[in-house]
């Protein structure tokens, strides 16, 4: 990704301590662009409500940290996704206090596809790890992207189950993406980069800090249609994620466990508070599939307005697009890249259409990122 003037401006803001979404919203209402904000004097920015430290950091950023971020962005797989970027996930934008910039390693398109968060205890039981893996496999095979926080225990089990099937998974981190925390998950993080995405609101060079992880948890829930808590003690950080999900109007699911297990007490509390008790991935799919399909169709209808013929109904244009995609698939396994070449659509368009077809039971996903039509081949 190039470090254009606008991107450089966003980096100035991302590196400024104490600049939150609310303050940036006020600034954008007063100035025409990020570049114009960065060209103001410190006193002008302070009149807009910023502290002296934040204002000075915007107009005169730390040269070393800025250079580090710019070098990081020269890698093809590294991205800076800002509020006004086409790839900024709309579901996260809907959430309160969403970060104004995301650093991403891997495929940023995944952030806008339907996701389910799977979270839980770092000190998970063997049964908890097995359960997280089982749910992650079933949910990813049903077309959802599994999102978690790259922590040990439940998070790692959910990510690993997806990676082992070559399914996409999103890991939200509480550090800069030039480092992995915990270090034990370096190999897992490298695998996620290849088939999914690593995400952080923190720029390169930022070390782990206890205050970062609640912010990470808010992004996890904000990206997701729902949050599943597999195992959690009464003070588990997973309960923070579930709390954010509820605040954001998202679904909260919890798996019950033994009344004698400390790692079940958090889930039992959530269920008492109204979380949906689930025993199988099908319970979640039944609840979230209609939302996933509706959001994807809404996204597609917005883009389709620009491409469809005059006076042709949007629904008709969308249906024609699906018919074209199914015809291009044929009856043999095919990859997303193969369909992009056959249809002339973007990878994002093909991916979202495939997800809808999968949720509707018309196609199935196979190993190696391939898809195939279900049913009987027409003669």
Task: Give short role names for the model-derived ranges.
Residues 2-6, 82-379:
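Glycine-biased, small-residue-rich flexible motifs in mid-sequence functional cores and linkers
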């Amino acid at each position: 990704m190039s470090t254009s003037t606008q991107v450089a401006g966003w980096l100035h803001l991302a590196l400024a301590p104490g600049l939150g979404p609310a303050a940036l919203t006020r600034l954008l209402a007063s100035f025409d662009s990020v570049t114009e904000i960065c060209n103001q004097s410190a006193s002008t920015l302070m009149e807009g409500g910023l502290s002296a430290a934040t204002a000075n950091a915007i107009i005169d950023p730390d040269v070393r940290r800025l250079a580090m971020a710019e070098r990081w962005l020269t890698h093809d797989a590294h991205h800076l996704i800002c509020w006004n970027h086409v790839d900024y996930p709309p579901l996260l934008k809907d959430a309160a206090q969403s970060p104004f910039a995301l650093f991403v390693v891997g495929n940023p398109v995944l952030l806008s596809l339907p996701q389910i968060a799977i979270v839980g205890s770092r000190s998970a039981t063997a049964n908890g790890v097995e359960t997280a893996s089982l749910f992650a496999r079933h949910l990813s095979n049903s077309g959802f992207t599994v999102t978690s926080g790259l922590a040990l225990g439940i998070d790692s089990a959910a990510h690993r189950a997806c990676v082992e099937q070559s399914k996409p998974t999103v890991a939200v981190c509480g550090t800069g993406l030039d480092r992995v925390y915990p270090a034990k998950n370096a190999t897992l993080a490298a695998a996620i980069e290849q088939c999914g995405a690593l995400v952080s609101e923190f720029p390169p060079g930022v070390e782990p800090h206890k205050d970062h992880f609640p912010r990470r948890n808010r992004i996890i829930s904000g990206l997701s249609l729902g949050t599943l808590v597999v195992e959690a003690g009464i003070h588990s950080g997973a309960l923070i994620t579930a709390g954010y999900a509820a605040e954001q109007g998202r679904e909260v699911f919890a798996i019950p466990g033994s009344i004698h297990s400390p790692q079940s007490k958090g889930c039992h509390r959530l269920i008492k508070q109204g979380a949906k008790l689930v025993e199988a991935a099908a319970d979640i799919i039944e609840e979230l599939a209609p939302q996933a399909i509706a959001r994807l169709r809404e996204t597609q209808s917005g883009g389709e307005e620009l491409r469809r013929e005059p006076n042709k109904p949007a629904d008709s244009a969308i249906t024609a697009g699906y018919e074209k995609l199914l015809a291009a698939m044929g009856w043999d396994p095919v990859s997303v890249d193969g369909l992009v070449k056959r249809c002339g659509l973007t990878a994002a368009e093909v991916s979202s259409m495939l997800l809808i077809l999968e949720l509707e039971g018309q196609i199935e996903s196979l190993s190696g990122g391939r898809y195939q039509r279900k049913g009987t081949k027409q003669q």
